[in-house]
Amino acid sequence: MKHLLKLQDLDKNEILDILNLADQLKYENHNGIEHHHLKGKTLGMIFQKRSTRTRVSFETGMYQLGGQALFLSNRDLQIGRGEPVQDTARVLSRYLDGIMIRTFEQKEVEDLAEYGSIPIINGLTDYCHPCQVLADLMTIREYKKSFDGLKFCFIGDGNNMANSLIVGAITMGMECAIACPNDYQPDSEIMKWANENGKFTCSDDILACAENADIVYTDVWASMGQEEEKAEREKVFKDFQINDKVMGVAKNDAMVLHCLPAHREEEITAKVFEEHANEIFDEAENRLHAQKAVLVKLLAD
């Protein structure tokens, strides 16, 4: 494992290795056991999209691992003034031990990896969000103990989260059902791959997708950069909500996950959110532990 650019780059055993290490790091963290695996290491964090969870979890993670993190916005980088990504990659590779980037274009992440000489971590692009899904898988395993025989249901926009969740669910052997409007489906190549490699469905039939689900997941209707589409999206997605009706067809012990931030009474009702708040905030915490595992895998000597 040289980089984390997208979840498709990892096989089942590699994901399990990360989850096992994340579990260990979480246990040590909760029990006051220091683990300075990255003493003397520096992570550069490039943010072209704002974030709460990504910045805080990576910065805290590097500190807990004995290293340090540098926050770099567009205003701090010549890349924001037209410097080619390949030049930025080669320069930062001389100063840093790794780069985490949260940006719009997947190509920018791929270019950093191609032209740089240090590990690159995809903190989010419009195409995928591998770090979040590693935390999701960690949380599912904590609650369900195993991925065997589980049905995973996602309700909402077929966006970067849906793309990575499909890959994560199918890779780990879960059945995966996506409920979304027909014009907002996930990436066609990812859906083709999912059909070839597991049990996968995508339709606008919300209740059929949620039927007998072990995990029900959602995300905001309008992601960052889609603010001008918000009113239109609210009309299109108004029925694509996790509510009592949806939970009524899922399994009795179904868990609910949300990558946050949540817009109550839009993609999820306040009632369902609060009933499953422990799961959702365990999931949020697990961003820290899953990403620390990725950092150790990539940056430790």
Task: Annotate the PLM regions.
Residues M1-V56, T60:
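Positively charged, low-complexity intrinsically disordered leader regions
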Residues T42-L43, F47-Y95:
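Active-site cofactor/substrate anionic-group-binding motifs, chiefly glycine-
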Residues Q48-T60, E142-T218:
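Glycine-rich phosphate/diphosphate-binding loop of Rossmann-like nucleotide-binding domains
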Residues L65, Y95, Y115-G116, M172, ...:
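Short, structured coil segments at secondary-structure junctions
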Residues D97-G168, H258:
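Anion-binding alpha/beta catalytic cores of soluble intermediary-metabolism enzymes, centered on
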Residues N195-K271:
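Rossmann-like adenosine-cofactor binding region
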Residues D253-A254, L260-D301:
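Adenosine-phosphate binding glycine-rich loop
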